[in-house]
Amino acid sequence: MKITALASAILAVVHGALALPARAPALDITLSQVNNTRIKAVVKNSGSEKITFVHLNFFNDPSPVKKVSLYRNATEVEFTGIKQRLRSDGLSNEALTTLAPGATYEDEFDIASTANLTQGGPVTVRTQGFVPIAMNNKIAGYIPYSSNELELEVDAVKAVAVPASIKPLDRRTKITSSCTGDRAAVLNTALRNAASIAGKAANAASSGSSALFAEYFKSTSGNIRSAVAARLKAVASEASLNGGGSTTYYCSDPYGYCDSNVLAYTLPSTNEVVNCELFYTLQEVTNDCHGQDQATTIIHEFTHAPGVYPPGTEDLGYGYSAATALSANNALNNADSYALFANAVYLNCQGQTGGQTMWDGNSQPGQTAPGTQTMWDGNSQPGQTEPGTQTMWDGNSQPGQTEPGTQTMWDGNSQPGQTEPGTQTMWDGNSQPGQTEPCTQTMWDGSSEPGQTEPDAHTTWGNFYQA
């Protein structure tokens, strides 16, 4: 199956067009006013495939999280609810929502419960960002969401009558009486580790690897490097003060917003940080690139607190794939970007994933097959090509087998995984499997007829942004 250079070029262009899904996965949010400050959000799966996502820190979360942004005269109204850090694996089913293509669900909430709207008058409401998708109860990637812009005329008298979601507590001490015994020891160690790791990350932001910095903050400009370094330096300083700084720290939950999926949360409006029970199950410091631990959880939470470094950050992209998909300006305002960068500096993670962290199919999805570019998505049709490699599914056995350093495929006549050296041997679907299609990259595409040629390209299919 030989083709000319011109045909190869034409097919490569066609491949580039076909590689994108017909309807990229996304959630569309329609906001409407129920009455005064009470809002209804209709969440719709606008993509072409069923998706499962984490609805914590999103619509359907019963906690007072930031679901929308509010603006008065183009200035954002201060949010007075909580910002949570979630576990990345072992998520409970109750934290997940599954939507078929075109399916919707609704969530109603009162924006006056998490913002001071007693002034009344015109307020603009909108939201956008990324929501984590999940597979096997683990965060495996992300999809974007965005809403319409809703204009309200707030009745101040009615807004005053809405109770605040967070009741003020006595905060006379910086590290509260909940931090005693073993929990005090855990917190003190975590603060020391956070101070050390954040300090190293601040130095790396100022004068370290530009490639590593750009991986997380999408820029190497001096202004952005200085801004990141300044925030991380402030986080390191806050952690080193061990209770003498701007935050108030709780070793247990005084407000009742922890659950089995939340590591910790911050109340930015009062600079309070709360550890949940799950925090104490984390390692002090992880050995895994982009893993979660106690130290980087504190870094994440301290970036939310404006008393540490104003303004506090948001949760715009959660996890490595979402955080590294943000623009430079959004990454500057994203808590997980700082925690992930600090982890990467500490463990020297540059190049270990290259942004190609995929499913391995043998354990939890989202793991990287170390030392190779062998990846599986475990979720779609066999024959998909993962970018940067020519390693593919065979569709007949278990995913996760590695064919390193070759274009090794199943030949169908003997044991799977045999190597056809010196060729790009694939299934052609028309005769016996294992035939050789020399001088081309002939492969299954999983969506049409087998045996199509995708010359001089890595054919990529898949309707999710992979983790």
UniProtKB/Swiss-Prot annotation:
Judging by the UniProt lineage, the source's domain of life is Eukaryota
What's a single GO BP term from this record? proteolysis
| SUPFAM superfamilies assigned to the protein according to its UniProt record, in alphabetical order | Metalloproteases ('zincins'), catalytic domain
Query: Which major enzyme category is it?
Result: hydrolase
What InterPro entries does this protein's entry cite? Answer: Fungal_M35_metalloproteases, Lys_MEP, MetalloPept_cat_dom_sf, Peptidase_M35
Binding, Zn(2+): 300, 304, 315
Task: Give the annotated active site.
Answer: 301
Keyword tags:
Cleavage on pair of basic residues, Disulfide bond, Hydrolase, Metal-binding, Metalloprotease, Protease, Secreted, Signal, Zinc, Zymogen
E.C. number: 3.4.24.39
Which portions of this protein are annotated as coiled-coil regions?
none
Leader sequence segment:
1-19
Q: What does this protein do?
A: Secreted metalloproteinase that allows assimilation of proteinaceous substrates. Shows high activities on basic nuclear substrates such as histone and protamine.
Q: Please give the family membership noted in the entry.
A: Belongs to the peptidase M35 family.
What name does UniProt use for this protein?
A: Neutral protease 2 homolog NFIA_031120
